[in-house]
């Protein structure tokens, strides 16, 4: 299966850097490929709702979706106000793009430099476990692998014991 990249809004720069390395490695292996990036978009309607739109076929491909839930610089207009995207907005866009490729891609992996909800790794009294539930939701949607960096508490992967969870520590570099 061919490997392809999808960038959620706000992760274009990181996706571009990953793509540069992949193109260089492919050329060294004798594969002439201009880019691994699939054009996509998450347009918003006037109501504030959005949709995920993938602009090329992904049939049979291994898809890596890059999302940066901690990027607060991404904005969108809603009722003539400029809104900054929250981690919840980024996670919703990730799920939209997963839905857009579901059932067509061979395998879906998510590259999430900052783990969504990662600071909420254990429950105290009556509070939510957003990270664990988010990982379970991604697994239910068909995501096979999560790649993250320096997870606050890597034991959160216990929420999805059958899904691959790669936590790269910066000390490895």
PLM region descriptions:
Residues 1-173:
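PRPP-associated nucleotide enzymes
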């Amino acid at each position: 299966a061919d490997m392809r990249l999808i960038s959620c809004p706000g992760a274009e720069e990181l996706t571009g850097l990953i793509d540069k390395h992949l193109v260089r490695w492919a050329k060294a292996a004798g594969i002439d490929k201009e880019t691994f990036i699939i054009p996509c978009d998450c347009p918003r309607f006037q109501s504030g709702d959005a949709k995920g739109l993938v602009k090329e076929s992904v049939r049979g491909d291994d898809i890596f979706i890059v999302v940066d839930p901690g990027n607060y610089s991404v904005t969108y207009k809603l009722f003539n106000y400029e809104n900054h995207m929250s981690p919840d907005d980024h996670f919703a866009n990730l799920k939209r793009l997963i839905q857009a490729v579901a059932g067509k891609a061979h395998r879906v992996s998510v590259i999430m430099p900052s783990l969504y909800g990662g600071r909420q790794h254990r429950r105290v009294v009556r509070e939510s476990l957003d990270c664990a539930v988010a990982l379970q939701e991604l697994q239910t949607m068909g995501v096979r692998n999560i790649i993250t960096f320096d997870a606050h508490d890597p034991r959160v992967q216990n929420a999805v014991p059958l899904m691959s969870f790669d936590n790269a520590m910066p000390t490895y570099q």
